Amino acid sequence: MPQRHPQPAHPADGVYFGLMSGTSMDGVDGVAVRFETGRAPVVLAEAFVGFAQSLRDALFALQQPGDDEIDRESVAANALVARYAVCCHELQRTAGLSRDDVRAIGVHGQTVRHRPERGYTRQLNNPALLAELTHVDVIADFRMRDVAAGGHGAPLAPAFHATVFGAPGDTRVVCNLGGISNITILPAEGSDVRGFDCGPANALIDAWATRQLGKPYDDGGKFAARGTVHAALLDALLDEPYFTAPPPKSTGRDLFSAAWLDAKLAGFAQVAPEDVQATLTALTAVSVAREIARHAAGCKAVFVCGGGARNPVLLDALRRALQEAGVLATVDTTAALGVPPQQVEALAFAWLAYRFTARLPGNLASVTGAAGERVLGALYPR
Protein backbone atom coordinates (compact mmCIF):
# COMPACT_ATOMS: atom_id res chain seq x y z
CA MET A 1 0.00 0.00 0.00
CA PRO A 2 1.21 3.58 -0.60
CA GLN A 3 2.62 5.29 2.47
CA ARG A 4 -0.15 7.01 4.39
CA HIS A 5 -0.48 8.63 7.76
CA PRO A 6 -2.60 6.79 10.34
CA GLN A 7 -5.95 8.12 11.42
CA PRO A 8 -5.64 10.40 14.45
CA ALA A 9 -5.45 8.46 17.70
CA HIS A 10 -6.85 11.48 19.55
CA PRO A 11 -9.22 13.13 17.09
CA ALA A 12 -9.12 16.89 16.64
CA ASP A 13 -12.25 16.77 14.52
CA GLY A 14 -13.96 19.98 13.54
CA VAL A 15 -13.95 22.87 11.09
CA TYR A 16 -10.65 24.29 9.90
CA PHE A 17 -9.77 27.09 7.52
CA GLY A 18 -6.90 26.67 5.08
CA LEU A 19 -5.23 29.67 3.44
CA MET A 20 -2.72 29.46 0.62
CA SER A 21 -1.08 32.23 -1.38
CA GLY A 22 1.35 30.67 -3.81
CA THR A 23 4.26 31.80 -5.92
CA SER A 24 1.95 33.44 -8.46
CA MET A 25 1.20 36.02 -5.74
CA ASP A 26 -2.13 37.08 -7.23
CA GLY A 27 -4.18 36.52 -4.07
CA VAL A 28 -5.13 34.06 -1.37
CA ASP A 29 -7.26 30.94 -1.80
CA GLY A 30 -9.23 29.89 1.26
CA VAL A 31 -11.39 26.94 2.22
CA ALA A 32 -13.53 26.05 5.21
CA VAL A 33 -13.47 22.29 5.66
CA ARG A 34 -14.78 19.81 8.19
CA PHE A 35 -12.48 16.94 9.16
CA GLU A 36 -13.87 13.87 10.90
CA THR A 37 -11.89 10.74 11.67
CA GLY A 38 -12.48 8.01 9.10
CA ARG A 39 -14.44 10.25 6.74
CA ALA A 40 -13.53 12.27 3.68
CA PRO A 41 -13.09 15.99 4.31
CA VAL A 42 -16.16 18.09 3.54
CA VAL A 43 -15.66 21.57 2.06
CA LEU A 44 -18.14 24.03 3.53
CA ALA A 45 -17.03 27.16 1.69
CA GLU A 46 -14.30 28.54 -0.52
CA ALA A 47 -13.10 32.07 -1.17
CA PHE A 48 -10.51 33.95 -3.18
CA VAL A 49 -9.29 37.39 -2.16
CA GLY A 50 -7.05 39.19 -4.62
CA PHE A 51 -4.01 41.31 -3.82
CA ALA A 52 -3.75 44.95 -4.82
CA GLN A 53 -0.99 45.69 -7.32
CA SER A 54 0.89 47.66 -4.66
CA LEU A 55 1.03 44.56 -2.43
CA ARG A 56 2.05 42.35 -5.34
CA ASP A 57 4.84 44.78 -6.20
CA ALA A 58 6.06 44.72 -2.60
CA LEU A 59 6.01 40.91 -2.54
CA PHE A 60 7.85 40.60 -5.84
CA ALA A 61 10.48 43.09 -4.66
CA LEU A 62 11.12 40.99 -1.57
CA GLN A 63 12.00 38.00 -3.74
CA GLN A 64 15.44 39.54 -4.27
CA PRO A 65 17.91 41.04 -1.77
CA GLY A 66 17.48 44.77 -1.24
CA ASP A 67 17.77 47.65 1.19
CA ASP A 68 15.86 47.90 4.48
CA GLU A 69 14.40 44.44 4.00
CA ILE A 70 13.29 43.96 7.60
CA ASP A 71 11.04 47.02 7.56
CA ARG A 72 9.68 46.33 4.07
CA GLU A 73 9.05 42.70 4.95
CA SER A 74 7.19 43.58 8.15
CA VAL A 75 4.99 46.18 6.49
CA ALA A 76 4.18 43.82 3.61
CA ALA A 77 3.40 41.00 6.06
CA ASN A 78 0.83 43.15 7.83
CA ALA A 79 -0.81 44.12 4.53
CA LEU A 80 -0.81 40.47 3.47
CA VAL A 81 -2.45 39.33 6.70
CA ALA A 82 -5.14 41.98 6.32
CA ARG A 83 -6.14 40.21 3.09
CA TYR A 84 -5.97 36.85 4.82
CA ALA A 85 -8.39 38.14 7.45
CA VAL A 86 -10.79 39.30 4.74
CA CYS A 87 -10.66 35.78 3.27
CA CYS A 88 -11.41 34.24 6.68
CA HIS A 89 -14.37 36.53 7.24
CA GLU A 90 -15.70 35.65 3.78
CA LEU A 91 -15.41 31.95 4.59
CA GLN A 92 -17.29 32.48 7.86
CA ARG A 93 -20.02 34.42 6.09
CA THR A 94 -20.43 31.94 3.24
CA ALA A 95 -20.47 28.87 5.51
CA GLY A 96 -22.64 30.51 8.17
CA LEU A 97 -20.02 29.95 10.86
CA SER A 98 -19.20 31.88 13.99
CA ARG A 99 -15.58 32.25 15.04
CA ASP A 100 -16.22 29.74 17.83
CA ASP A 101 -17.16 27.13 15.22
CA VAL A 102 -13.64 27.17 13.78
CA ARG A 103 -10.98 25.04 15.46
CA ALA A 104 -8.03 26.72 13.76
CA ILE A 105 -6.75 28.48 10.67
CA GLY A 106 -3.89 26.81 8.80
CA VAL A 107 -2.02 29.55 6.94
CA HIS A 108 0.99 29.02 4.72
CA GLY A 109 2.15 32.61 4.29
CA GLN A 110 3.93 34.01 1.24
CA THR A 111 7.26 32.46 0.34
CA VAL A 112 9.91 35.14 -0.23
CA ARG A 113 13.02 32.95 0.16
CA HIS A 114 13.41 29.19 -0.08
CA ARG A 115 16.96 28.07 0.65
CA PRO A 116 16.85 24.77 2.51
CA GLU A 117 20.45 24.10 1.52
CA ARG A 118 21.31 27.01 3.83
CA GLY A 119 18.96 25.78 6.53
CA TYR A 120 15.99 28.07 6.10
CA THR A 121 12.84 28.89 4.21
CA ARG A 122 11.00 32.16 4.74
CA GLN A 123 7.24 32.59 4.45
CA LEU A 124 6.06 36.16 4.91
CA ASN A 125 3.34 36.17 7.55
CA ASN A 126 2.14 37.67 10.83
CA PRO A 127 0.09 34.88 12.41
CA ALA A 128 -0.20 36.77 15.69
CA LEU A 129 -1.99 39.58 13.85
CA LEU A 130 -4.22 37.10 12.03
CA ALA A 131 -5.24 35.56 15.36
CA GLU A 132 -6.05 39.05 16.64
CA LEU A 133 -8.09 39.99 13.58
CA THR A 134 -10.09 36.75 13.42
CA HIS A 135 -10.23 35.66 17.09
CA VAL A 136 -9.43 32.12 15.92
CA ASP A 137 -6.38 29.97 16.72
CA VAL A 138 -3.80 30.24 13.94
CA ILE A 139 -1.30 27.55 12.98
CA ALA A 140 1.56 28.67 10.76
CA ASP A 141 5.25 28.13 9.94
CA PHE A 142 4.76 24.59 8.68
CA ARG A 143 7.93 24.26 6.62
CA MET A 144 10.73 25.08 9.06
CA ARG A 145 10.21 22.01 11.25
CA ASP A 146 10.92 19.81 8.24
CA VAL A 147 13.96 21.92 7.29
CA ALA A 148 15.24 21.64 10.86
CA ALA A 149 15.07 17.86 10.44
CA GLY A 150 17.27 18.06 7.35
CA GLY A 151 14.46 18.18 4.79
CA HIS A 152 13.62 20.61 2.03
CA GLY A 153 10.44 21.79 3.75
CA ALA A 154 8.72 21.20 0.43
CA PRO A 155 6.61 19.98 -1.07
CA LEU A 156 4.27 19.37 1.86
CA ALA A 157 1.07 18.69 -0.08
CA PRO A 158 1.98 15.06 -0.98
CA ALA A 159 1.01 13.82 2.49
CA PHE A 160 -2.44 15.30 1.95
CA HIS A 161 -2.58 14.01 -1.63
CA ALA A 162 -1.86 10.49 -0.39
CA THR A 163 -4.72 10.72 2.09
CA VAL A 164 -7.31 12.09 -0.34
CA PHE A 165 -6.28 10.94 -3.83
CA GLY A 166 -4.50 7.61 -3.32
CA ALA A 167 -6.12 4.46 -4.76
CA PRO A 168 -4.80 0.93 -4.08
CA GLY A 169 -3.87 -0.84 -7.29
CA ASP A 170 -3.74 2.39 -9.28
CA THR A 171 -0.55 4.43 -9.77
CA ARG A 172 -1.50 8.09 -9.99
CA VAL A 173 0.36 11.36 -10.30
CA VAL A 174 -1.02 14.57 -8.83
CA CYS A 175 0.54 17.58 -10.56
CA ASN A 176 0.28 21.04 -9.05
CA LEU A 177 0.77 23.77 -11.64
CA GLY A 178 1.16 26.85 -9.49
CA GLY A 179 3.98 29.34 -9.77
CA ILE A 180 6.24 26.29 -9.54
CA SER A 181 5.24 22.84 -10.79
CA ASN A 182 5.43 19.85 -8.50
CA ILE A 183 4.29 16.26 -8.67
CA THR A 184 3.15 13.67 -6.15
CA ILE A 185 3.58 10.03 -7.17
CA LEU A 186 1.01 7.76 -5.52
CA PRO A 187 2.22 4.23 -6.33
CA ALA A 188 -0.08 1.26 -6.70
CA GLU A 189 2.35 -1.03 -4.90
CA GLY A 190 3.63 -0.71 -1.36
CA SER A 191 6.48 1.71 -2.01
CA ASP A 192 6.67 5.14 -0.47
CA VAL A 193 4.85 8.17 -1.78
CA ARG A 194 7.26 10.49 -3.57
CA GLY A 195 7.00 14.11 -4.59
CA PHE A 196 9.16 17.05 -5.58
CA ASP A 197 9.25 20.34 -7.47
CA CYS A 198 9.78 19.95 -11.21
CA GLY A 199 10.50 23.54 -12.25
CA PRO A 200 8.78 26.79 -13.22
CA ALA A 201 5.13 26.94 -14.20
CA ASN A 202 2.97 30.05 -13.89
CA ALA A 203 5.80 32.06 -12.32
CA LEU A 204 7.48 32.56 -15.71
CA ILE A 205 4.35 32.24 -17.85
CA ASP A 206 2.68 35.03 -15.85
CA ALA A 207 5.81 37.17 -15.72
CA TRP A 208 6.13 37.16 -19.51
CA ALA A 209 2.42 37.89 -19.98
CA THR A 210 2.72 40.83 -17.59
CA ARG A 211 5.75 42.19 -19.39
CA GLN A 212 4.30 41.84 -22.89
CA LEU A 213 0.56 42.36 -22.35
CA GLY A 214 0.35 44.31 -19.12
CA LYS A 215 -1.89 41.56 -17.75
CA PRO A 216 -1.26 39.48 -14.62
CA TYR A 217 -1.54 36.14 -16.41
CA ASP A 218 -2.06 34.48 -19.79
CA ASP A 219 -5.83 34.05 -19.71
CA GLY A 220 -6.65 30.55 -20.93
CA GLY A 221 -3.25 30.30 -22.58
CA LYS A 222 -4.45 32.48 -25.46
CA PHE A 223 -1.17 34.37 -25.75
CA ALA A 224 0.79 31.11 -25.95
CA ALA A 225 -1.69 29.71 -28.48
CA ARG A 226 -0.79 32.54 -30.89
CA GLY A 227 2.84 31.44 -30.90
CA THR A 228 5.01 28.51 -31.90
CA VAL A 229 7.46 26.68 -29.68
CA HIS A 230 11.03 27.75 -30.51
CA ALA A 231 13.06 24.54 -30.29
CA ALA A 232 16.46 26.14 -29.72
CA LEU A 233 15.10 28.42 -27.00
CA LEU A 234 13.39 25.47 -25.33
CA ASP A 235 16.69 23.58 -25.31
CA ALA A 236 18.42 26.61 -23.77
CA LEU A 237 15.77 26.88 -21.07
CA LEU A 238 16.07 23.17 -20.29
CA ASP A 239 19.84 23.55 -19.98
CA GLU A 240 19.57 24.10 -16.24
CA PRO A 241 21.04 21.59 -13.75
CA TYR A 242 17.92 21.62 -11.58
CA PHE A 243 15.93 19.77 -14.24
CA THR A 244 18.15 16.69 -14.08
CA ALA A 245 18.92 16.78 -10.34
CA PRO A 246 17.56 13.77 -8.43
CA PRO A 247 14.89 14.15 -5.77
CA PRO A 248 14.37 15.10 -3.02
CA LYS A 249 14.49 18.62 -4.40
CA SER A 250 12.57 21.87 -4.23
CA THR A 251 12.85 25.22 -5.93
CA GLY A 252 11.21 28.61 -6.28
CA ARG A 253 11.67 32.13 -7.55
CA ASP A 254 15.12 32.16 -5.96
CA LEU A 255 16.21 30.25 -9.07
CA PHE A 256 13.45 30.61 -11.67
CA SER A 257 13.16 34.38 -11.61
CA ALA A 258 12.69 37.05 -14.26
CA ALA A 259 16.46 37.54 -14.13
CA TRP A 260 16.98 33.85 -14.92
CA LEU A 261 14.63 34.16 -17.89
CA ASP A 262 16.34 37.31 -19.17
CA ALA A 263 19.72 35.58 -19.04
CA LYS A 264 18.33 32.68 -21.07
CA LEU A 265 16.71 35.04 -23.59
CA ALA A 266 19.90 37.04 -24.15
CA GLY A 267 20.78 35.11 -27.30
CA PHE A 268 17.23 34.98 -28.65
CA ALA A 269 16.27 38.61 -29.20
CA GLN A 270 14.70 37.74 -32.56
CA VAL A 271 12.11 35.39 -31.07
CA ALA A 272 8.61 36.89 -31.17
CA PRO A 273 6.93 37.51 -27.78
CA GLU A 274 4.14 35.04 -28.49
CA ASP A 275 6.71 32.38 -29.42
CA VAL A 276 8.51 32.99 -26.12
CA GLN A 277 5.19 32.45 -24.34
CA ALA A 278 4.52 29.24 -26.25
CA THR A 279 8.03 28.06 -25.37
CA LEU A 280 7.63 28.88 -21.66
CA THR A 281 4.40 26.88 -21.70
CA ALA A 282 6.26 24.00 -23.34
CA LEU A 283 9.03 24.31 -20.73
CA THR A 284 6.53 23.68 -17.96
CA ALA A 285 4.98 20.73 -19.79
CA VAL A 286 8.25 19.10 -20.82
CA SER A 287 9.92 19.47 -17.42
CA VAL A 288 6.93 17.83 -15.73
CA ALA A 289 6.60 15.08 -18.34
CA ARG A 290 10.28 14.16 -18.16
CA GLU A 291 10.13 13.82 -14.38
CA ILE A 292 7.05 11.60 -14.64
CA ALA A 293 8.82 9.49 -17.27
CA ARG A 294 11.85 9.10 -14.97
CA HIS A 295 10.02 8.32 -11.76
CA ALA A 296 6.49 7.13 -12.63
CA ALA A 297 6.60 5.86 -16.20
CA GLY A 298 3.87 3.31 -15.50
CA CYS A 299 1.29 5.78 -14.27
CA LYS A 300 -1.98 5.77 -16.17
CA ALA A 301 -3.48 9.04 -14.96
CA VAL A 302 -2.21 12.53 -14.14
CA PHE A 303 -4.51 14.83 -12.16
CA VAL A 304 -3.74 18.55 -12.28
CA CYS A 305 -4.47 21.20 -9.67
CA GLY A 306 -3.38 24.81 -9.19
CA GLY A 307 -3.84 27.79 -11.47
CA GLY A 308 -2.45 25.94 -14.48
CA ALA A 309 -5.49 23.66 -14.41
CA ARG A 310 -7.42 26.61 -15.88
CA ASN A 311 -5.04 26.86 -18.85
CA PRO A 312 -6.20 24.44 -21.58
CA VAL A 313 -3.20 25.25 -23.76
CA LEU A 314 -0.87 24.18 -20.95
CA LEU A 315 -2.86 21.00 -20.32
CA ASP A 316 -2.71 20.10 -24.01
CA ALA A 317 1.04 20.77 -24.00
CA LEU A 318 1.38 18.42 -21.03
CA ARG A 319 -0.54 15.69 -22.87
CA ARG A 320 1.77 16.02 -25.88
CA ALA A 321 4.90 16.09 -23.73
CA LEU A 322 3.86 12.95 -21.86
CA GLN A 323 3.23 11.14 -25.13
CA GLU A 324 6.62 12.24 -26.47
CA ALA A 325 8.23 11.02 -23.23
CA GLY A 326 6.60 7.61 -23.67
CA VAL A 327 4.13 7.95 -20.80
CA LEU A 328 0.68 6.62 -21.73
CA ALA A 329 -1.35 8.57 -19.18
CA THR A 330 -4.53 10.55 -19.34
CA VAL A 331 -4.49 14.15 -18.10
CA ASP A 332 -7.42 15.55 -16.17
CA THR A 333 -7.92 17.94 -13.28
CA THR A 334 -8.53 16.90 -9.69
CA ALA A 335 -12.19 17.77 -10.25
CA ALA A 336 -12.42 14.26 -11.72
CA LEU A 337 -11.55 13.00 -8.22
CA GLY A 338 -14.12 15.24 -6.56
CA VAL A 339 -11.86 18.13 -5.52
CA PRO A 340 -11.88 21.36 -7.58
CA PRO A 341 -8.29 22.17 -8.59
CA GLN A 342 -8.34 25.64 -7.04
CA GLN A 343 -9.12 24.16 -3.61
CA VAL A 344 -6.37 21.56 -3.32
CA GLU A 345 -3.52 23.65 -1.91
CA ALA A 346 -5.68 25.49 0.62
CA LEU A 347 -7.21 22.17 1.66
CA ALA A 348 -3.73 20.80 2.25
CA PHE A 349 -2.95 23.54 4.76
CA ALA A 350 -6.27 23.10 6.52
CA TRP A 351 -5.33 19.41 6.79
CA LEU A 352 -1.89 20.29 8.15
CA ALA A 353 -3.58 22.44 10.81
CA TYR A 354 -5.78 19.46 11.66
CA ARG A 355 -2.72 17.23 11.92
CA PHE A 356 -0.98 19.75 14.17
CA THR A 357 -4.00 19.97 16.46
CA ALA A 358 -3.96 16.17 16.78
CA ARG A 359 -0.16 16.35 17.29
CA LEU A 360 0.41 14.05 14.33
CA PRO A 361 3.10 14.39 11.65
CA GLY A 362 2.38 16.31 8.48
CA ASN A 363 5.43 15.61 6.33
CA LEU A 364 6.61 12.58 4.42
CA ALA A 365 10.32 11.92 4.83
CA SER A 366 10.28 10.04 1.51
CA VAL A 367 9.29 13.32 -0.15
CA THR A 368 11.24 16.04 1.66
CA GLY A 369 14.34 14.11 2.66
CA ALA A 370 13.88 14.91 6.36
CA ALA A 371 15.32 12.62 9.02
CA GLY A 372 11.80 11.48 9.85
CA GLU A 373 8.18 12.49 10.15
CA ARG A 374 7.52 15.54 12.30
CA VAL A 375 4.58 17.51 13.67
CA LEU A 376 4.61 20.68 11.56
CA GLY A 377 3.56 24.17 12.56
CA ALA A 378 3.41 26.62 15.44
CA LEU A 379 0.32 27.75 17.34
CA TYR A 380 -0.78 31.37 17.81
CA PRO A 381 -3.79 31.24 20.15
CA ARG A 382 -6.84 33.39 19.59
Swiss-Prot record:
Annotated positions binding ATP: 22-29
Pathway(s): Amino-sugar metabolism; 1,6-anhydro-N-acetylmuramate degradation; Cell wall biogenesis; peptidoglycan recycling
Xref: Pfam families: AnmK
Residue ranges of coiled coil: none
InterPro entries: Anhydro_N_Ac-Mur_kinase, ATPase_NBD
Catalytic activity: 1,6-anhydro-N-acetyl-beta-muramate + ATP + H2O = N-acetyl-D-muramate 6-phosphate + ADP + H(+)
EC number: 2.7.1.170
Alphabetical UniProt keywords: ATP-binding, Carbohydrate metabolism, Kinase, Nucleotide-binding, Transferase
Biological processes per GO annotation: 1,6-anhydro-N-acetyl-beta-muramic acid catabolic process; amino sugar metabolic process; peptidoglycan turnover
GO terms for MF: ATP binding; kinase activity; phosphotransferase activity, alcohol group as acceptor
HAMAP family: AnhMurNAc_kinase (MF_01270)
Family: Belongs to the anhydro-N-acetylmuramic acid kinase family.
Protein task: Catalyzes the specific phosphorylation of 1,6-anhydro-N-acetylmuramic acid (anhMurNAc) with the simultaneous cleavage of the 1,6-anhydro ring, generating MurNAc-6-P. Is required for the utilization of anhMurNAc either imported from the medium or derived from its own cell wall murein, and thus plays a role in cell wall recycling.
This protein's name: Anhydro-N-acetylmuramic acid kinase
Gene it is expressed from: anmK
